[in-house]
Amino acid sequence: MARKTERVILVALNEPGVLGRIAGHIRHEGWNIKRLIADEDEVPAVAGDDGVSEGNKTSTIEIDIEGTHTKLAQVMERILNLNCIVSISMIQNGEKIIRHRPLETKKSEKVEEPAVKTPPKKTGSFRILAINPGSTSTKFALYDDENCILAKTIRHDSAELARCGALLDQKELRRDCLLKDLKAAEVELASINAVAGRGGLLKPIESGVYAINEKMLEDLHSATAALHASALGGIIAAEIAGQQGIPAYVVDPVVVDEMDRNAKLTGMPGVERSSIFHALNQKAIARRLAAQLGKPYENARFIVAHLGGGITVGAHRYGRVIDVNDGVAGEGPFTPERTGAIPVIPVINMCFSGEYTQAEMIEKVTRRGGIKAFLGTSDVVEVEKMVYNGDEFAALVLDSMAYQVSKEIGAMAAVLEGLVDAIILTGGLAYSNRFTGAIKQRVDKFAPVHVFPGEDELLALAGGVLRVLRGQEQAAHY
């Protein structure tokens, strides 16, 4: 079939990573992006972390895309479901088509859209509901085996979340919004075979698919787990599953700990290195590459770098992550908003200077460091626009982050004794050819470099549960 080029004009809210999310959806459908222009500047498509900028400022994005099929309207319809999109215009069969959606909503649920009827479950397939709560959103998707038949992101109003009080008290609000969307899509809960929830800050566990039990629910309600909205994933999953008499699971939560003993030791007794990283996405992408290479993940030696608002680089040896930088506690490369590893004595001096509280220092390390501290933004799309417009300091900062990622990959190559089958770059920042190119230039002598831009944690959740339902993997017990 002859390839053809279509031009699409999007109006989108100025959100972090908006270009990357749009580009990811288009590429996922089998189209190639030939040109992408935003705000009259040609910039690479890069994705950052989820988040909504204050106000309703918009950008006009012009894309030329090339593909071998004629399903562009369906692709654009799915892109219109992204909360960042205000309108889409395109030419279809010689006719200009314009689709709009309201700029904002004050409700916790998404702007009302025409109900999309979910197709009936195929005979012999497994239907899995996957739930991934974020700080101000709840993402969910419905899968028939590996096929996504419904996916939504519910944006919650910050003021309404605040009225709930404690984070765990948001459960009813988020659950009810999710159930409302399922009902609007005519999904019968009785058609679902299992529910997967994003696991929170549980006790350290090995990688796997874990059946949610009373002990896990107790820990998900603990003070530590309640620090992050991901705890609500397991709680809501268990509640929905319990009402239907079906199993609920979590898959590879951030606390997966398979580190070698000598990787945990530090030079200060009483302070050990912890394994807190993007386990779900790292493991899922590693399995995907292993399948492409025709090699079981359990027989592979990979280095996986998750590149996003947080950056973690893991050494995967025969199915286990034997070393990885702690993406929260200040290890590894600096990131769009985290400091990464920094000299300790100057930090001690800052802590005892009397200028900062403990909370302020933690904020500086985890949310106001890295690129944001240097350039005032954590949005790498904006940083690349600065570089494109000739900002030499912005180029230095971005290239320094790539340098530090490369150095961390080199460290993990040493952990694997130089025997590396492949290096994987994934996460939102992997959409940037400039950023991944700078890393490749330094590390491609260690092993072939494979780039998997973006992440699909909902698919990873569903995929883990599907392996259990098919009998390919046994569920672990917490």
Put a short name on every predicted segment.
Residues 231-239, 250, 265-301, 310, ...:
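Glycine-rich phosphate-binding loop plus the immediately following alpha-helix
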Residues 150-188, 216, 220-225:
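N-terminal phosphate-binding loop and adjacent alpha-helix
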Residues 363, 367-418:
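Adenine-nucleotide phosphate-binding core of ATP-dependent small-molecule kinases
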Residues 182-229, 247, 255-267:
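Short beta-strand-loop/turn "lid" adjacent to the catalytic site in phosphate-handling enzymes
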Residues 420-439:
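Glycine-rich phosphate-binding loops at beta-strand->alpha-helix junctions
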Residues 38, 128-169:
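Short glycine-rich, Thr/Ser-proximal phosphate-binding strand/loop in the N-terminal lobe
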Residues 430-431, 437, 450-478:
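Glycine-rich phosphate-binding/hydrolytic loop that grips phosphoryl groups
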Residues 1-110, 115, 204:
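A conserved regulatory-domain signal marking ACT and ACT-like small-molecule sensing domains
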